[in-house]
Amino acid sequence: MPTPSMEDYIEKIYSLIETKGYARVSDIADELFVHPSSVTKMVQKLDKDEYLIYEKYRGLILTPKGTQMGKRLLERHALLESFLSIIGVDPSHIYHDVEGIEHHLSWNSIDRIGDVVQFFENHPDALKTLKAMETNKPETKE
C-alpha cells in the first residue's frame, strides 16, 4: 500500500498526465510546492514499487498499476469534495478539508460516502430537507 505522501504524488502525476498528456519532475514540483530533488526521490521510489517507469532526463510514465491507483485517488478526492458540498461545508474550506481527511479514511468508508452521495443525487427531496436543516442552524465561526 502506498503511503499518504506516495498517494499525493500518484494522484498529482495522474492528474497532470490526464490534463497535459505528460508529467515532468518540474511540473510535479510546481504542483506540489516541493523541490525537484524531492520529486526525483519519490519518483524513484514509485518506480521501485512499480507505480511508474522513470528514466532520468527522459520523463516518466505510469504503469497500469499506477494508472489504476491514480484514477482511484482522483475519484476519491472528487467524491469527498462532492460529499462535503452536499452536507453544506463552505466551498472555501472544501479543498483543504479533503486534503486533511482523504488519507485517513478506509476504502470501505469511501465506498459508504459514495453511497450517501449517490442517495442524495437520486433523491433531490432528501437533499432539500438536508439543506433546510442547514439553514435553520446558527452559523458557526472559525
From Swiss-Prot:
Tell me, what controls this protein's activity?
DNA binding is strongly activated by Mn(2+).
In Gene Ontology terms, what is a biological process of this protein? intracellular manganese ion homeostasis
**What Gene Ontology terms describe what this protein does at the molecular function level?**
DNA binding; DNA-binding transcription factor activity; manganese ion binding; protein dimerization activity
Q: Which InterPro entries has this protein been placed in? A: DtxR_MntR_Metal-Reg, Fe_dep_repressor, Fe_dep_repressor_sf, HTH_DTXR, HTH_tscrpt_reg_MntR, Iron_dep_repressor, WH-like_DNA-bd_sf, WH_DNA-bd_sf
Give binding positions for Mn(2+) 2.
11, 77, 99, 102
* Entries under SUPFAM superfamilies matching the protein: Iron-dependent repressor protein, dimerization domain (SSF47979), Winged helix' DNA-binding domain (SSF46785)
Record note on quaternary structure:
Homodimer.
What the protein does comes down to: Central regulator of manganese homeostasis.
Give the chief site where it resides.
cytoplasm
Positions annotated to bind Mn(2+) 1: 8, 99, 102-103
Species of the source: Listeria monocytogenes serotype 4b (strain CLIP80459)
Q: GO cellular component terms?
A: cytoplasm
UniProt-listed SMART domains: HTH_DTXR
Q: What's the name of the protein?
A: HTH-type transcriptional regulator MntR
